[in-house]
Amino acid sequence: MRRLLDVLREDLALTGTKGGCGEGECGACSVLLDGAVVDACLVPICQVDGTSIGTVEGLGTEAQLNDLQAAFLENGGAQCGICTPGMLMAAEAFLATGERATDDSIREAIAGNLCRCTGYTKIVEAIAQAAERRRTSANYPD
């Protein structure tokens, strides 16, 4: 069985999505499937026909980061980088809900993503900053 993770990385050269545990435990391979966070290592490719798949490559570019990526950079939300793409995708899905961004709600949203470097504080701060920017931006009205 081919996994979504394999097709993204090997066939489509979308290597931002990381392979971690291969068992759906670490979240390094988190992508959006019809707007919901899924672990690409657990999704058979045959189940994604007709769906919308979002990867970290779709958030922004090296020259033009999106607001969430910029907040991660500004707040030191990435260290070794292994968890960062999955964290960004989980955070993006959370922010898209419009739910109030509290420490607890952010931590719950990223609970499926493990980070061994940061202790999560900087990640939570980055997501909160991006949420506030979106809340006050003309592009993201209340």
Model-derived features: where do they sit?
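Signature of N-terminal electron-transfer/Fe-S-associated modules in redox systems
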Residues: M1-D142
